[in-house]
């Protein structure tokens, strides 16, 4: 274990917690921090050392990882003289796994202490991907920094070098842009089929074996069928990502109406069911308005239990 770099890990939520556990299982010495005592207890039970703060976690790390819900959380953790960024030692590497603003990551890299490297590495693949090491990680950074990060991140899933610092977040947000559009569209497609006499199981099978197939069809539709709508990701976080996507879209000199429409229907779902409601309530809104049921019998194991 002495040959392994010392890992600091801040943010042990739905995604960060399983990622931290995978690094522990791979043999890395991990120091962890989270404001949630239960999350900390799970990490320490698996062998992590408990840090007293995010800054304390950063101070002894060779590689420091953050996995936080929103950019403002990253700013709270990293910024200022007492923040984690200032405590990173020369030669260390900060890997931000948060879906973040490109400009924020670039600004923190410019402020980093001498000899500290930074990469952005937001992830996709949901909670089950985090648990099973089947995430996709989009990394932005220099070639040497990517190589160093990849040696650790490969224990979490497929690692893709997207280009210079910040491009990891651009790619992640593009993938989410497509997910939001498709998540909204699948509810409309199911509603059209049901309202015109097609049985839901037949419709789902047909879509999976057609040009309409997608990750959403295979991975997320069962959460609709089960009726829990996947509470591992909230409408509030969907809208946060959609706002970040719209910031990127300001650089596109064309109208992008599908993204605008997706943001609108997610906002409508949040206004009706609450910001904390599960992400696929964007489909429940269609069910409720159309008086249709999209329940389908089956052994639908929730993604966070897979």
Where are these regions (language model features)?
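Rossmann-fold dinucleotide-binding core
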Residues: 7, 100-180
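Rossmann-fold NAD(P) dinucleotide-binding segment
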Residues: 54-117
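NAD(P)+-binding Rossmann beta1-loop-alpha1 motif at the extreme N-terminus of oxidoreductases
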Residues: 1-67, 92, 97-98, 127, ...
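NAD(P)-dependent dehydrogenase/reductase Rossmann-like domain
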Residues: 273-306
């Amino acid at each position: 274990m002495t040959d392994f770099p010392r890992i600091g890990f801040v943010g042990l939520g739905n995604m960060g917690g399983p990622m931290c556990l995978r690094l522990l299982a791979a043999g890395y010495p991990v120091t962890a921090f989270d404001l949630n005592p239960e999350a900390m207890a799970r990490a320490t039970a698996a062998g992590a050392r408990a840090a007293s703060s995010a800054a304390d976690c950063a101070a002894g790390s060779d590689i420091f990882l953050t996995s936080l819900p929103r950019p403002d959380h990253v700013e709270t953790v990293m910024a200022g003289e007492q923040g984690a960024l200032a405590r990173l030692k020369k030669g260390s590497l900060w890997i931000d796994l948060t879906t973040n603003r490109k400009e924020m990551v670039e600004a923190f890299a410019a402020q980093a202490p001498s000899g500290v490297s930074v990469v952005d590495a937001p992830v996709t693949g949901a909670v089950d991907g985090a648990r099973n090491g089947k995430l996709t990680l989009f990394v932005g950074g220099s070639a040497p920094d990517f190589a160093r990060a990849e040696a650790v991140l490969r224990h979490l899933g497929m690692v893709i070098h997207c280009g210079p610092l910040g491009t990891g977040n651009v790619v992640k947000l593009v993938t989410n842009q497509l997910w939001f559009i498709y998540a909204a569209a699948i509810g409309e497609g199911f509603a059209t089929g049901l309202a015109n006499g097609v049985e839901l199981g037949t419709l789902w099978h047909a879509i999976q074996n057609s040009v309409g197939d997608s990750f959403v069809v295979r991975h997320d539709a069962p959460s609709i069928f089960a009726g829990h709508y996947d509470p591992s990701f909230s409408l509030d976080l969907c809208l946060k990502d959609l706002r970040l996507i719209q910031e990127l879209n300001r650089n596109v000199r064309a109208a992008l109406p599908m993204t605008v429409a997706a943001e609108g229907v997610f906002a409508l779902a949040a206004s009706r069911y609450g910001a904390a409601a599960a992400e696929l309530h964007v489909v429940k809104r269609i069910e409720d308005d159309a008086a249709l049921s999209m329940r389908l019998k089956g052994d639908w194991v929730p993604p966070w239990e897979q």
